[in-house]
């Protein structure tokens, strides 16, 4: 993923702008409409941009027809246009008024012995899986499972009672009731 490489190299010290990106909703190779696939990819894209790339300042999409037959014109496909509009308006992180401020939300990638506050926090998952074929994610926090069924697979976890303790968080992603990915984290809860 080119964006991962650019972000990993510069994201911690430079603002990032993605220009000239887009999803053609017509496959030239197969000569078929792939609107449903593009709508899902667009939903994933706008859901995960502020989570995975919090220092990304702007993402600009193509809005034109390609001479090679690829279709990027948003206004010509109502489903893709609707997904685009929903993507940019559903998150408070995307602002339409430059003088307004997005909410103070911070995302951190979990790793073992990561420190979390003794408070209620939200956990979410970014699962790198071909075609993102995940039906649901189960988070088990100190033996108590909670399930989320849609991206970004968010659940609330209250660490208030675990101040000064180590908490075990097991995350399992499922497809057709079979585990496709899992990871366990040991987190330090602050006093």
Q: Where are the language model's segments positioned?
A:
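Generic detector of leucine side chains in alpha-helical contexts
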Residues: 3, 49, 56-61, 73-74, ...
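Substrate-binding surface in catalytic domains of secreted glycosidases
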Residues: 1-7
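Long, low-complexity serine/threonine/glycine- and acidic-rich segments characteristic of extracellular
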Residues: 102-191
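Substrate-binding cleft of secreted/luminal carbohydrate-active enzymes
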Residues: 14-102
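Active-site neighborhood of glycoside hydrolase catalytic domains
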Residues: 11
């Amino acid at each position: 993923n080119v964006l991962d490489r650019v972000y990993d190299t510069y994201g911690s010290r430079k603002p990032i702008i993605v220009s000239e990106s887009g999803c053609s909703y017509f496959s030239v190779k197969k000569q078929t409409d792939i609107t449903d696939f593009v709508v899902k990819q667009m939903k994933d894209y706008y859901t995960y941009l502020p989570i995975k790339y919090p220092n990304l300042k702007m993402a600009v999409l193509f809005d034109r027809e390609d001479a090679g037959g690829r279709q990027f014109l948003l206004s010509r496909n109502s489903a893709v246009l609707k997904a685009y509009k929903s993507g940019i308006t559903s998150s408070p992180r995307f602002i339409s008024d430059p003088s307004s401020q997005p909410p103070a939300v911070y995302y951190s990638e979990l790793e073992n012995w990561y420190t979390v506050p003794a408070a209620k926090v939200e956990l979410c998952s970014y699962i790198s899986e071909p075609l993102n074929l995940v039906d649901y994610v189960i988070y088990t926090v100190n033996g108590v499972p909670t399930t989320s069924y849609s991206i970004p697979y968010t659940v609330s976890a209250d660490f208030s009672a675990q101040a000064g303790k180590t908490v075990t968080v097991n995350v399992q992603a499922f497809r057709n009731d079979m585990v496709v990915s899992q990871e366990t984290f040991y987190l330090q809860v602050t006093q």
